[in-house]
Structures are given as C-alpha cells and as structure tokens.
Amino acid sequence: MFNRSNTAGGSQAMKEGLGINKLSPISSNSNPSSLTSSNYEKYLQLATEKNPCMILELELDGKVRYGSPQWNTITGVADDSGSSPTYIADLILGSDQDKGVFQKATDMLLMNDDTSCTITFKIKAADYEGSAGCDDESTITTLEARGILIRDGHTQLPSHTMWIVKPRTNDWSDFYANEDAQDDMVIQLSDNCDDIDIQLPEEFAKTLGFGAKIFVQYLKRIRLEMIIDEFNLPLPKMELCRVCENFVPVWWLETHSQSCVCEHRTESLIQLLHDNLLEQQAILANFTKDSEYKGSQIQVRSNNFLNQVLDSLRELCQDAIDINPSEMVPDLYHSLSTFPQDNGNNNNNNNNNNNNNNALLDQFPIQKDTVSLNSYFQFSPRTNHNIQNVTSWQSRFFLNDDQDPGLALLIHDTLDLARKKVDAVLRLDNAMTYSLKIKNEVNNYVVQLIREQIEINKHAILTHPMNLRSSSIFHSPLPQIHSQQPEAENLIYSSSTPLQVQHDQCASFEAPSKSHLEPIPFPVSSIEETPTANDIRHPSPLPRSCSNTVMKLPTPRRKLDSNGLFSDAYLNADIIPNPSIESTISIDRDNNTNSRGSSMKQYGIGEATDSRTSNSERPSSSSSRLGIRSRSITPRQKIEYSHVDNDDRTNEMLSRDKDSLQPQPSVDTTITSSTQATTTGTKTNSNNSTNSVLPKLMTSISLTPRRGSPSFGNLASHSMQQTNSFKLIHDKSPISSPFTFSKDFLTPEQHPSNIARTDSINNAMLTSPNMPLSPLLLATNQTVKSPTPSIKDYDILKPISKGAYGSVYLARKKLTGDYFAIKVLRKSDMIAKNQVTNVKSERAIMMVQSDKPYVARLFASFQNKDNLFLVMEYLPGGDLATLIKMMGYLPDQWAKQYLTEIVVGVNDMHQNGIIHHDLKPENLLIDNAGHVKLTDFGLSRAGLIRRHKFVPHKSSLSISSTLPIDNPANNFTMNNNNSNHSQLSTPDSFTSDHKQYNRSKKSSLGQQYEHSEYSSTSNSHSMTPTPSTNTVVYPSYYRGKDRSHGSSNIDLPASLRRSESQLSFSLLDISRSSTPPLANPTNSNANNIMRRKSLTENKSFSNDLLSSDAIAATNTNINSNNNISLSPAPSDLALFYPDDSKQNKKFFGTPDYLAPETIEGKGEDNKQCDWWSVGCIFFELLLGYPPFHAETPDAVFKKILSGVIQWPEFKNEEEEREFLTPEAKDLIEKLLVVDPAKRLGAKGIQEIKDHPYFKNVDWDHVYDEEASFVPTIDNPEDTDYFDLRGAELQDFGDDIENDNANILFGKHGINTDVSELSAANLSPPLNHKNILSRKLSMSNTTNRSSNNSNSSVHDFGAHTPVNKLSIASVLESVPQETGYITPNGTGTTTTSAKNSPNLKNLSLAIPPHMRDRRSSKLNDSQTEFGSFNFRNLSALDKANKDAINRLKSEHFSEQPGVHRRTSSASLMGSSSDGSVSTPGSNASNTTSGGKLKIHKPTISGSPSTFGTFPKTFLRSDSFSTRSYSPERSISIDSSTLSRKGSIIGDNQQTTANSSDSPTMTKFKSPLSPANTTTVSSYFSRQRVLSKSFSQRTNSSDLSAEESDRLQAISRVNSLRNRRRSGRKSSSTSEIGYHMDVLVCEPIPIHRYRVTKDLENLGCTVVSVGAGDELVSRATSGVSFDLIMTALKLPKLGAIDIVQLLKQTNGANSTTPIVAITNYFQEAATSRVFDDVLEKPVKLDELKKLVAKYALKKSQEDEEHTILSDSDETH
C-alpha cells in the first residue's frame, strides 16, 4: 500500500497514523455454516472499519478546504482554522509540474465535469518518532486521489473539488528502485498457492499492464508442469478482439485494444473523407458558371478563368482520391542480419554467441520476419507523389471572398477535404508503425521469458532429479533480462511505446546472450522541440522527446484498485493521434535507403535520419530516484484538423523513422478539442538534444467517465452473460473493416470460404496467421485488418417481417453469437423507386444517433452486388402497431409512458436538426425492457415531398446521372468488372480506361421502370406492376388485419376500419414512400436526381452531435450531396388539392399521420409536422384507430385538412373517462391543430412538457422508469411479437468481390495456373484449431456446419496431439477454418477441402507478377449508395473493455481467500433446451396465470386490473440478445473450453412460436406494486468486491491488520451467499429482510433509533456518525444493500459525498442511497438520492422503504442463485 522502501518503523508509524490497529486474526478454518448472526455483524464491522481512505476538499485554486483526520495525521497539517491556508501544491514533492498536478486536474474537471479524475502524487509524511530529520525515501508516501467537481447547489457554479485519497495500492511502479539499479529492475510476483516467484522485466510489465499478471500465471504453469520441451508448451488462453476480430492472448488484449480501436477509427475517418472527396469530384465534374455552391452564386465573368480553377481543383481532388494508406513491406536486407543465427546486433559492436541448438527461428526460417522488427510500412510511389501534391498545393488564383464567395468556398472546401485525408492517412501510418513496434517488442520478451523458464526447468531436473518440486527449484528466479551495457544512458519507458533510447544519451538494449532474441534497439531521432500552449492542450498518448533523466511516460498501469473497473490508461486511450500533414517522416534502415525513405525525402515530406545510440555516462541526481513519472491521459476527444501553415506543423504522434518512435511529452494536459499548433520541429544532433528534454514527473493524472457513461455504466447486470453457440475459429469475412488497405498475409487455405477476398501476399518471406496460437505471437498482425462486414458473417435464422423493398431477418453473428436484426434492401428496387437518398439518410442518421437511448442502434452496414444490409439492434418486443392490434387500445398508464418517451426522442432529434417526417406506430419499436425506440429515418431531414413526387427540370438532372461514361474527365471510379488485379485506389496500377464511372446501371434501371405503374391489392403484399393505375399502397409488416378488429369494445363505424390494402407497411422498412415513375420519357435519368440531393437544404447537424471528426465526416457526407443546386426547387409540392376533382396525383404509403402542411407542400422543413404525428399516435394508443382514418388516401387528406377529429361515440361522460381523461383529450386537441403556428409545441418543447397531462412526469429520467409492459422473451430467437407478412428466407447473393474470385484462384479458390506448385514439400502446420477440435469432440453434441458452400466437415481430433504446442510451430502459417463451440463445451470444426499441407504456402509460390495487390476499399466501385461500409466502433470498443473487465474479475476470483460463486455464465440460465426459467419454483404458474383477458378489458388505470405478474429477469441491460455485451466470453481457454451457461442448449428444441401473429399471452402488465422493481447491478458490485479483495490479498507487504480485514470481507461474502440461499427457500411471509445497511447520522439518538428499527426489521446495520467514516466504510470493498445518511453532516455535505460515491467506480457506486432529513425539499431537488425520508422516521415508513429495496435485492438474489447453480452444474 505504501512504498516498499519504507522502513519497518516508518511503516508501522504510518499504520498507526492511519488508525490501523492490530486485530485478532480470524481463524481461516472456521466453519461458515456455524456462524451466527452476531458473527456476521462482527465480520461486517471488521470488513469495513479502518479503511485507509481519506476525504480531501480543495478550493478551485488548490487551497485545502477540508481534510480528514487521517490526512492531517499523514501530512502533519494541523486542523486549525486560524492558521494560514494550506495549498496542496506545497505538500507535493517533485517539480513545479508535479506540484501543479491537482490544478491541472481541476482544469480538466472544469472543462468536463462528467468525468472523475484520478491522480497519483508523492508527499513527505509527517515526522514520526525516530525519523525526525530523515530525508530519505522512507518518509515519502505515494498517494492516489480520485475526485470530482462539486457545484454550488443554488448557483450551479463550480464550487470546489472533492477527493477520495488513499495510499496507492501495490503497483508495478511500487517496485521501482532508484536510477542506479534501473538496469537490474525486475518485478516480483508471488502466488499465494505455491509461492512461486516470477520476475518480469520492468518495461515488459509496464507494456502489458494488467496482462503481466496473467502472463506470470502462464509462466508459473510452465514451471509447475516442468515443461522442458518447446513442443509441449500448454495452450494459452485466447480472447477475441471485437474490433479487429482476431484472437489474441488474454495478457495482450488490453494493450492491443488501445491501438486497435485507434487504428480502426482512423480508418473509418479515411473512408468517410474519401467518400466526401468522390462527392466533391462529382460536383466539380458538372460545375458551370450558372451553378450555385451551398447557396452562393458563382460570380466570375470569364468562363476560361472558371475552367482553369475547376481543372486545378479536379486535379487536386483526383490526387487526394488516389492516396492510399501505407502497406507493410519487409526489409529483406536487414531481416537476414537481425536473426539469432547472425550472432549480433546491428546497432552495436557486441556479438552474442549462439549456443542454443533449439533456437526458435533456426527451425522455421520461413517465419523469421514474423518477429523481425525490420518490417515497416511504406507508401506507394504514386501515393507519395500525391501526398506531396496535396500538401504543397497552392491556388494560382487569387480570389477575394467578397468578390466571389461561392467559388472561394468551393476552393476552400475541396482543399480542406484533400488535406484532411492526407492528414488521416499519415496518422494511420503512424499508428500502425507504433503498434507494430510494440507488438514485436512484446513478442521478443515473451520468447525470451518462456525459453528462460524452460532452461530453468531443464537445469532444475539436472540438479534436482529426485525432487523436481522442491522449493529450491521453484524459488529460483528467472535470469534477469537486462542491458549488457551497465553504462547505458537512461531508458525511456512507456506503457504504450517500445524501448527507446536517446541519441548519445540512451543505451541500446540487449537481451541476455543465451536467449538470442534481443529486443531490437529503437534509436530516437533528435528533434529539438519547445512545448507550446497548444502542445499542452493537445496531449498525445505517445511521448515526444527524451529526457535527461529517466522519463516514464505514462506511468505503468497499476494494479486495479478497488474502485476501478478498467485501467485509467485504457479508459482514456480513445484519442486518435493527430499528426500534421508536414510531419517529420524519417526512415532508418541502417543506412539502407529504401524507396519510401528516398521518395519522402524527395518530396520534402520528411528526411531519413540516422540517430544510432552511443554509450555515455549515466547522470545521477537525487530527484531522479523519486516517484512515479507523469501520465496525463485525457478522455475521448474530437479529431480536429490543423489549418496552420505547413511550416508551423510538426508531428504530434510519431517520428516517421520506422525504427524509432519519438517520445512526446504527454504532461501538462488539458482537455480540449481544438487542433494542435506546435512549434517547428528542428532537426538537431545529439549534442543539442538535451535542450528540449523535460523533467521527469512524480505525479500522474487520468480521467474516468462518471457512472452512467458508456465506459462502465450498467456493467453489473452484464456480468453473467455468455454466448450460446459461436464459432471458435471463424469464417473470415472480407479482408478488412471498414475497408481494406493492407495486405492480407494469409495463405489461401486460411480463408477457405472467402478466398476471393484474400489478396496474395507481396512478401515471399512474410506470413502471419490471423489468429495467434501461442504466447509467442502476442499481437495479431496489425496489417491483417478486421474483415469487411459481409452477410456471410451471419447465420440468418428466420424472417421477421417483409416490406416493400426487402425484408428484415433475425440473424446471429457466427463469430460471437450476438443476435441482430438485419434489414435487407434490394438495390434495384431502391434505385427504381428513387429511394437512394432515403437509404443514405437513414444510415447516416442512425450512425450519428447510435448512442441515443431512443434510437434503434445501428451496428454495421454493408452491401453486395444485389442488396444493402443494415445490421441493427434486435428489439424483440415488436412495434406499437402490433401492440395496439393485439390489445385493441392501451391503458392510459401505458400510453403515457410511450408518449413521454416519444416526446423526449422527437425533441432531441429536433435539437439536433433532424425532422423525422414519418412518425407512426409502425416506426416505434419496443425493446426488451419495454421502452420505445425510434427507427426508420428514411424520410428524415430531406423531407417527404421532394423525394415523393419531385419531377426535376431537365437542367437539374442528377450530377451522377449526367456524367458520360466515356468522358475521361469524369473517370474517377473504377468499373466493377476491372477490380480484381489492380489496386483500386492506385492510379499507377491501372490505366484510365479502367476507371470508368459506372452509371449505366442507373440509366438502364431508370428506363426499365419509366413506363411502369404500380398497384397493390389486398391479397398481395408485394408490388405488382400494372398499367392500370399509378397508385401503390404498401401493406404493414405487422398488421395482418384491421387494427380495429382487435379486442376494443368501442363500436367503431365501418368508415373507421381499415381495409387490408390501406394498411401502412412496416417501420422496419427504410421508407414508407417512394417516388412514382416519372411521366416524361425523355428524361430517362431524371429519376436519379435525388441520389445526389442532400438530406436537407442549408441545414446541418448541431455540433453537440459531432463528438469526433468521424461523425463530422459523416455529417459532411450527409450534406455534401447538396453542395450544388442547379435549379430552383419546384414550387408545386402539394400532395392533394381538395378542389381538383380531376387530379391524377396519387399517394402511396401511410397518409394517416401526415400533417396538413405536409399535404399542402409547405411543411418540409417545419418540425411542427412531427408534433402533429405525435398527436395522431397518442390518439391511436388510447382509442385504437387513427383520428383521420378513411378508406382512401384522398378521403384521409380531406379529413386532415379539415382538422375534424373523429372522436368515438360514448354513452356517457363516465364511459368516456374510462378511455380518455380530460387532460389527454385536451392534449390531443392541442396537438392536432391545423395551423402549425398555433399547434402545441410551436413555442418550444416546454409548453408540451408543461401540459397538465404530463404532471408529475420526471422528464430527466423517462427511460429510467419501469416500463408498464415488458415483453416476455422465452428464447433469444423469439420473434412472436412480429408478423412474418409472407417473408421467407432467401439467397442474398455473392459479395461484390466474389464476382472476380476465380480470376486468380479458379473455381475452388486455387490458382489453376500454378497448381503444380502445390506439390512442394512443405511441412504441415500444427493446427491450433484442430487441438481445440479434439478437445471439444470429447463431448457428444450435434455437429453444426457453417454457412459456407465451399466447406466440408472434418474431424481433425485424431491428427493432432492434445494440449501440446511448440514455440516454433506457432510461427508457421495457420489455416483459417470455421468452427463452433456448442453450449456444453463441445464443438466441431469446419474447414475447407483445400486445407492441405501441400497448399500451406501456396500463395508464397505465386510469382510476384501474378499476385494481386491488395485492393483498397477506398476506391471500390462507388455505387449510388457509396461505400456503405460502417461498423459501430464505439460498441466494439465497449465490448473489448467489458471483456477486459471480465478477465480481471475472473483473475481476481481465482485468488485464494476470495469466495465467489458467480462467473461469466449466461443470464439465460442453464436449461439445455434454451428456454428461460422465471426465478422461483413457481415460475411456470406465474407465467401462465398472467394472461390478460384482452377480449374484456376494463381500462380504468388501476394496477390491479391487469394482474400481478412478475417480470422476467431479461432486462435490457442483461438480456442475451444485447449485442456486444461484456459477458460474451469469446475466449479460448486451454483449461476450460466448455461454454458455461450458454444461452441456448445444443438441442435447441424450444424455438420461437412459428405463428405469424404474436401470441396473446405475450402481453402482460406487471402493474402490481409487488412487481414494479428493477434489476439493479448486483453482479457489478460483486465483481468490484471480488476485485478489491484480490488486489489487497496479492500485496506481498500486506499487513496483518489488513489481512484480517480482507478475511472478514471474504467471510461476509460467504455468509451473504448462505443467507441468500436460505432466503430462496424461505417462506414469503418471513419478516426479516436480511439487508446490509450503512447508516450515517451525526445525532446519536437518531442514529440509535434508526439502527434499532432496521435491526428489528432483520437488517444488519453498520452505523457511523461522520461523513469521513461514511466514505471510509462505503469504499472498503464491501457492497451494502442500502445506504442511509443524514443530509446535513459536520464539515462535509451529504450531497457531495453521494455524488462522489456514485460517480466513481466503487463497490457501492450503484447502491441505493436514501436521505434522512428535515429538509425534504432540498434533498428531493438535489436528484442524487434514490429516496428521501423525512424526520422523524416512523417505523411504518422505514419498513416500506426497506421492503421496497429488499424486493429488488430479492429478485437479484434469485437471478444470482440460478446462475450460480448453473455454473456449478457445469
């Protein structure tokens, strides 16, 4: 807990200062079953007392406002208000930057108070007895503080900061000694089970962070099993990275994830910018003097001048389009000299003797480059040239913005897009280079350590042949891995960078001579840089300059403390580094000039540098021996682009030297999103390099999002989920995601099902498996990007519904087992019916709105040659239209909930500049928690009318449709048919005639449907072209019959009943309307006009939506189509003319919810039209039919324009009140006002919220309220709430790339021209997946094959040894197969028939001239829909973090002394048939007994009317269909391969209801008070609790007192489990609530009274009297069930304490907190308490309160018990 260097006396004094007294030890062998209630109280008191945790309040200027007594004891500062004020900076040791660490943190919190900030700092402890005058490190204490910003309760202005301070837990940094012993530094871990000591190099441990602990366990396993042969190594546990979809060893996942998500976000940004450039090029291609640009008229008088400008811009745009990201290439020359057999290090004069006959790389020379550090990323010559052209482009035309604003804006926008793309491409290159260096360094360390351990085992067997397990063997430390040059200069260490050394100051790093696998030294180019203010504001996760003392930037990841779920570095590593365009790009290959380096130098982008290291004396200073170095990591930031001149740019991320990474200062950081403007980086020699060094820091800062943010909110209820069956070894999808721009180093058999998507490799010596199979390949090859999403990645399970343009299907992702709803849209239909803009609109809005709670999330989008695919969140509750149809109408309580959620969602959209235009019950989905989510944004923003019936003028045809195909000026996109052999985005790889702008398909489609007219009958749900009418009405996905035919007892007239042909179609279809065929046959391409129209005119998303440049680029993509307006908008936008009886305009779609202004063509940009639709929906919710419904659209239009609402006829007023309250009727009437200016909501959302109907609605927590109706989901594949509407499974066609698959690889994916090469004698690889297959085949299961038509089932179990793995074998190329792991731990492996040893390295034998260059998705043929590739990286990143959290929890739970029954089993229970059991033994009875009597509803609003049915525990935050949940343990564990608690059993006999209509029993309302409970985060608290246990128990210097306390915590946990088990079988009439309650009451009599009352109710109470004690108990690691506190506490405010507890990751961050106060109003308005009790507290009130939370806890306990029992059965 404190610095290891503390003396025993000092340590004891410190413990006494903290109040840690010696406690009598607890017997470890006591029987928990014999413990009484008093014993439980004793252990609970012991577990929570004397927690060394302090409270510190600081003014905004750093003055100490309040400190706990413990703080005063440690610092020696007297708590005397009369003394002079104490500033925190005066107490902190270190430099000025160290002293200002709290001020920096305060500034961060002031800019973003939604985060909590964690700081580590050092102080000098107060003089203790015997230590007076001592100035050594024994008096220095390292503390950690986590704090938040507190605002004044009245003014809401920042008031002060509050911090929880505690001694820092033992960390990697705690083991740092002084500088003099730096080279010999090791990390020593001790296992409590066998007490085996393992030592890791410091820098290696810092790089892995938490993963180092897992790797130590692997080394211990090697030692325990006495492995002496590389071929017998145990199989490491693997985990799936959700971002790149590669399996990585668990110890590498956390570090890998940081760089992986950074790279993919940059890739996504590049793709969006590339698409925008294509749009811009289309504008330039058809630009004329008479054109407008973004509303500005072009004012130039000379056509020649305009043409010169446009030609220059087109050339610039083309150069930017043809820029591709870099590719990895091997440095073949140096790769031969860097391997062990060369006995040397190229960077120094020391040679190592090769005395190891088992040298890893000697056995498999084909794989040498896999671990070589000399491979690097390189741009093609053409890309280099284009980068230079873009960065040096200067306009030759001097335009004054005032003279010609339109043309000036066009030039600015084009140049800005081009430079942004260059910037992003360079940034991606930096990120990939950085990742490669880290991976290679770690891989080398792993090889070294494993081989050293094997050598130790061999030596132990030789020296101790009779006693292999003697302690003398296991306590033999590993030979230390340290530098061979003791005079070496200071090393710069970082958790995110490889070893680096400063020129003439930093020494080369070598491995021990016996290992022969040294980490290659990384020389740092000396660049003199002066940090500016902008440098400080824009941190980089990478260091930028070396220091004259040891710099450790950032501080190593510390062991997870009791309040943290993720490491701070990982939570805040979302920054995408932002290098400038004129970055220093230097490539050093030991003076070997390569094409990239020379080309870069030639173009002036950078110069190659050679900064080799030399030996020099180590400087020593007292300051260099102290403390933890600085780490400043900011939360996620927007990507911004610098617009400063090139001369003012410098690289913010990395040196372009591919052998070095320039350290960059990441200190003195403030959160900001503006761009960096740094001083010029001047190249200097080593003698001048010290001028720019920074002092080392002894403080660190990290930011953690507060509770409720995506980073860690609601983790609890995710804790037990698992996938059902998933592919252990997966079908590889297309090469990369969201597009490909790197080589795929896999051989053909590694992608058996998608061989056409796998490019041949350019390097004959470099192959890398996509899935590492051992600890030696820790990182996946960063050049093998995640696959492009494809429909082949999913198992299509069943259709959900069918619409006009396509269908929606329930699908399960093969790799992860997650469930999604995939909307499939036929391109031909979308193009013919002018729905291109609608599709783009929906996709773009869902992308930017994906994190909104009211929007169905979009996880991915992609396309093939025939279809568009939108992968969305599967919401199993169906839509409101189905609910209304099944129930007739809804009770007022239900309707109010849905209406409030709709109002919140619509208002938020309006604030973000989005108008939905198509709100209706079919577009409102119900999630599994019962809340409403909006979908179908196809008509949003651009408006219904313009797309519905706009017949453009001849001169305003689509830009794209008017481009002549054979015009070279327009050739900017390559034809589909020529996309195989060329790198699509590299112009030098193909001729201009290959880049035809393919628009022929659109023209032909336009002609095909030009004379067609459509109709639909009541018997057909598909469109049938007929010449009889031009009206088409699409049926609903869900309404199979008249909605009024439900169980409503309102006698509706026949005119109000809908016929089948008049029902609207589903919400899940993209659009409910489309443009009719154009009447003018001469305009064959006219129907394409809207493909290039924007979603709205002169509107953009608000800035608060755009959290990053990726989203900004999305916004640009949305609106860039409207950059040019070629003609005025048509004036005739009306849909209906009441006075024109001869009109031939027909409407198709759903007219019932259209506003009058929309019908008249006036309301396209008027958001009031949405409020009209809300009024119609509300009417229908309460009464069961739309207010203006009629038999024909024309009749509907007439009624809407008249504004006459069709109220039902009631017998009397009393009957009317049963269905419609006066407030509800008034609200409907005010929303359905014909005049938009007088309609409710015209003056703002507040007038809607203030309506009497919404009285007592908490608008800030609408989506947090308990839903009235929660769908009953019996199976994750349940689709009972949906109508099929005739939807059927179908073949979705091949991917676009597959059309060209046979050109190189023939019919079966193998090049027939070189098939004779397959007979080469190539040794077969050891198949890691086959090993798994053998293990999995030990259990009986039903084999499942993949969806791959080219694959066949094989059982490889007999061909591979079990649990045997060679270090050398893992460096071989590994075939990529597909396989499933079934729920009971069994599985099969499906592999390609061409998986033959003879074909293992076939691609290596293909002659270079016959190999494809990898095809970049940047320039795949741009169809009408653009690239259409999207992946929700935020969700994937969250899934990775959840997986890391789960791994940490599992690791801690395995530690001794921690009793924990929970595991990562699925919340779906353990039933083998996949069904879900309701908690309790009478689950079936409660389910069957809860059927609503729909045929005789009595709508009175009374809860008892609808029964008392307990909800199932399938909540939205824990349900198995929730995608990317943290519990989806996609891992490969050598010890436990079975999937515990899978979602669905292997038999899967219990399937969803096959009927087309939802079953009536699904609709149940848990309105009884006994069932209005929510699932809280019990499992999260348990996980945090377990982590806090193991953190402290792992401390080797743990005090006896602390051990006693931790044993008590463990005992409390064990007893709590027993009490929970007892409650499960106890009688429901039992009075005792068995709650653990923490009470804080400063007045003793009140504290005594509340404590006694709670104890009488059966609670176990821990009572305290001050805020300090409250914080200490609440952060002790014990999770309480309820916390009760007085509002007014001495010195501290309860509101501030509650905010601190809830907004930091603690064991009680989710515990309900109740205020007991006389100030009821103040407590209630603070909105931080879960409940408020007014003094004096009566026993009845207290009993109701406890019963309320006990009921919630009981439900959690039942779930936990079911899941725990499920774990034990497995």
From Swiss-Prot:
- The Protein kinase domain sits at 794-1254
Q: What InterPro entries has UniProt attached to this entry?
A: AGC-kinase_C, CheY-like_superfamily, Kinase-like_dom_sf, Prot_kinase_dom, Ser/Thr_kinase_AS, Ser_Thr_kinase_AGC, Sig_transdc_resp-reg_receiver
Q: What class does this enzyme belong to in the EC scheme?
A: transferase
Instruction: Provide the positions where the record notes the PTM Phosphoserine.
Output: 380, 476, 709, 733, 736-737, 1044, 1048, 1064, 1421, 1531, 1538, 1542, 1565, 1764
Q: Where in the cell is it found?
A: Cytoplasm; Nucleus
What CDD domains does the record point to?
Answer: REC_hyHK_CKI1_RcsC-like
Question: What does the entry give for GO biological process?
Answer: cellular response to heat; cellular response to hydrogen peroxide; cellular response to nitrogen starvation; cellular response to oxidative stress; intracellular signal transduction; meiotic cell cycle; phosphorelay signal transduction system; positive regulation of autophagy
Q: Which residues carry this modification: Phosphothreonine?
A: T704, T747, T1075
Per UniProt, the ranges with Polar residues bias are 583-601, 981-990, 1392-1401
Q: Where is the AGC-kinase C-terminal domain?
A: 1255-1320
EC numbers on record: 2.7.11.1
**Residues of the active site:** D918 (proton acceptor)
> What does the UniProt PTM comment say about this protein?
Autophosphorylated. Phosphorylation by PKA strongly inhibits kinase activity. Phosphorylation by cyclin-CDK PHO80-PHO85 under favorable growth condition causes inactivation of RIM15 by promoting its export to the cytoplasm.
Q: Which UniProt keywords apply?
A: ATP-binding, Cytoplasm, Kinase, Meiosis, Nucleotide-binding, Nucleus, Phosphoprotein, Serine/threonine-protein kinase, Transferase
Q: How is its activity regulated?
A: Kinase activity is inhibited by phosphorylation by cAMP-dependent protein kinase (PKA).
UniProt lists the family membership as follows:
Belongs to the protein kinase superfamily. Ser/Thr protein kinase family.
Q: What's this protein's name?
A: Serine/threonine-protein kinase RIM15
List the source organism: Saccharomyces cerevisiae (strain ATCC 204508 / S288c)
